[in-house]
Amino acid sequence: AYLTGEQMLERAGLRAGERVLVTGASGGVGSGIVQLARARGAIPYAIAGKGKEQAVLDIGAEKVITRGVADLPAAVNEATGGQPIDVVADLVGGAIFNDLLRILRPEGRYTTAGAIAGPVVQLDLRTMYLKQLQLHGSSQGTRADFRRIVRYIEEKKIKPLVGGVYKLSDFHRAQTDFMAKDFVGKLVVVPDAVADTAEG
């Protein structure tokens, strides 16, 4: 998750002092991006599900917008105090895609590595070329990204969030909980013997 997030920020060229809007910020990759943005000295704003706002603030989000808000551009503008968004790190896709492009400042950068709300979107090319936006797809990280992540962990700049640990024999329950999306971070499935050793 952190490797994917680091590559997204690297491809978008996120720099210290810039503002980044993170969708899906309570998930494994999204929560990683919030922390990775802070580690770079950037200012992360987040979109997360209802009831998860405080957890996302606790990992470093400047402000959290509740997913499903009626007017996303207005909510982001209010959250930033009218300051522009330099980068959108989108893990959701779907119906909010065009709003995310409208939220970006001229010459802003959009990066994606997910489409949980839907992979097919409509793009008004005028939005892209009149604002001179950069659109980046990202699916995997590099060794250099991995080395930065290890350094951030050693420096205690990031801390992976574990939303739950399940025995392999409880995989069905882990999948059910994953689909319910009632957690923040990642769910971990371990072999029964490892879980039994940890419990004992």
Set out the residue ranges of the language-model regions:
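Structural detector of well-ordered beta-strand residues that form the stable sheet scaffold
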Residues: L21, Y45, R109-T111, H136, ...
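Short conserved AdoMet
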Residues: R15, R105, D182
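Mid-domain Rossmann-like dinucleotide-binding core that forms the NAD(H)/NADP(H) cofactor-binding site
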Residues: A1-A70
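Local beta-strand N-terminus motif with an aromatic residue
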Residues: G17, A61, P84-I85, I158, ...
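C-terminal hydrophobic helical "lid"/dimerization subdomain
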Residues: R143-G200
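Rossmann-fold dehydrogenase core element
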Residues: P106-A113, Q122-G164
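Glycine-rich cofactor phosphate-binding loops and adjacent beta1-alpha1 units
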Residues: D58, E62-Q132, A195-E199
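Short, glycine/polar-rich helix-capping loops at beta-to-alpha or helix-loop-helix junctions
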Residues: A48-L57, V120-L125, R147
